[in-house]
Amino acid sequence: MSTILTNEEKAAIVSQHIKNIEYSIDNLEVSIIEEEAVQAPDSNKISNLNSDITELNAKKAALTAELATLSA
């Protein structure tokens, strides 16, 4: 048996995913600060962290667009 969610319930789920992504982005930004603070920062690690942030921002944009359709 499948349950049909209302748009409001779906929007709440999407909003929570967006919030989780925002936490992840903040965490990655702190990791960059930490890496830049060491004697010899690893530029590859910083680059990878920035790539991860870019991917998360793309996911956040997609979810934000989905949230807009659910709220319309």
Question: Where does each model-flagged region fall?
Answer:
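Short, charge/polar-rich alpha-helical segments
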Residues: 1-30, 34
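A general, composition-driven signal for non-globular sequence regions
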Residues: 4, 11, 39, 53-54
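Charged, low-complexity interaction regions
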Residues: 4, 34-46
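Short, intrinsically disordered, low-complexity terminal segments
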Residues: 8-9, 34-37, 58-65
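Amphipathic alpha-helical coiled-coil segments
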Residues: 24-28, 48-72
